[in-house]
A protein has these predicted regions:
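Short linear motifs at secondary-structure transitions and domain/linker junctions
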Residues: 1-5, 18-23, 50-54, 97-101, ...
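Conserved active-site and cofactor/substrate-binding residues in soluble primary-metabolism enzymes
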Residues: 4, 8-12, 21, 50-54, ...
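A phosphate-binding glycine/aspartate-rich beta-alpha loop in the early core of alpha/beta enzymes
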Residues: 39-71
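Glycine-rich, aromatic-bearing surface loops/beta-hairpins
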Residues: 80-143
Length: 143
């Protein structure tokens, strides 16, 4: 146990966050996300039983978002014609605003999101049941 580090962050995840450098990305995937096939040879960290919002909040206590890009946070946009509400996006926005005010969030078409996710340094698998709750974070620098 360590003080000041959310207990949700496993030693494996802390190691990955420390290994990542400026510009590296990671994806937090919901329960429907194809974690293993997207991860390929990248680290796949399982946080079953946890939701994407709580994982995002825990990670952002330690993880600086990139201020040198227009939008260091990417969400998978809803597929046209898919009549799905995305209230979790509001939760994400509040969490991001709490940790790094003024951060821009962009929405990425589904298959483009998958392509970007395949390039991520690591993939985090959650038990999130909300649809379209996938998020890519780009690491910044500690100032």
């Amino acid at each position: 146990m360590l003080k000041g580090i959310p207990s949700l962050l496993s030693p494996e995840l802390l190691k990955v966050l420390m290994e990542m450098g400026h510009g590296d990305t990671l994806v937090i995937g919901d329960g429907n996300f194809p974690h293993a096939s997207i991860a390929g040879d990248s680290p796949l960290i399982r946080l079953d039983g946890h939701g994407c919002a709580e994982v995002l909040d825990a990670i952002l206590t330690l993880f600086p978002l990139d201020t040198y890009v227009d939008a260091p946070v990417s969400l998978m946009e809803v597929v046209p014609g898919d009549n799905v509400e995305t209230p979790i996006w509001d939760e994400f926005a509040k969490i991001i605003e709490k940790h790094q005010p003024g951060t821009t969030i962009r929405h990425v078409e589904r298959f483009s999101f998958y392509d970007e996710a395949k390039k991520c340094y690591a993939v985090i698998s959650t038990g999130e049941t909300a649809l379209y709750a996938n998020v890519i974070l780009q690491k910044g620098v500690v100032k």
